[in-house]
Amino acid sequence: MSAPEEMTLKVIAHIRTAFPTKFGIPRQSGLVDSLRGEVIFTPEYRNADAVRGLEDFSHIWLVWQFSGAVRDSWSPTVRPPRLGGNTRVGVFATRSPFRPNPLGLSSVQLETIEHRPDVGPVLIVRGADLMDGTPIYDLKPYIPYADCHPDAAAGFTAQTQFHHLTMVCDAGLWARVPADQQAALQGVLENDPRPSYQHDPERVYGMEFGGLEVHFKVDGEVLTVTGIDRR
């Protein structure tokens, strides 16, 4: 019997993160380990038996949908931001959301599993690169002996440069950030949340993070926070 050309996937969970919009989300999972997220199962899958033994793993894979970048069609080539936004590469040589099946794959740290009476087991994760409310279709344990490839070739990503910025912020302004969010927000800002092709030192950028509206400018390797307001 031949396999069907299409299949239906069920959303098993949604993730809660500090990012209500796409802007500012780290470009890959694991870049900001202090970012906290909660994976909350949909009612059908709120079964403690389904996660039995998962607590013995330190990391998990999340299979999710690019729900913030849904298109009716796909493109065989895309322009990765890390290449300046002008060079085209085959979509299957990238992690672009504009693919035939808009699925993402992220490796995150599993900090703990909380069992809550209202929503069942909740996975507390660190280092996710997902927007708040992103639907998750599957999760699997990360298995080091099979999933880790230290000698793997990195393709065009080996040629790109990650900009690690120095963050500068007035102490009084920074005090507006709750203490339990400061490390995560600093990590996001130091990883340069700007689009890779934008380098105007006079431009003021704004991003939403954990109920805050954060504004900043970047000049060279220094990011200066210019405003933090509660939304």
Model-derived segments and their meaning:
Residues M1-A48, L54-D56, Y142-V188, S196-Y197, ...:
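Arg/Lys-rich, positively charged N-terminal/basic patches that mediate binding to nucleic acids
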Residues E114-G127, C148-A154:
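Short acidic, Gly/Pro-enriched loop/turn segments at secondary-structure junctions
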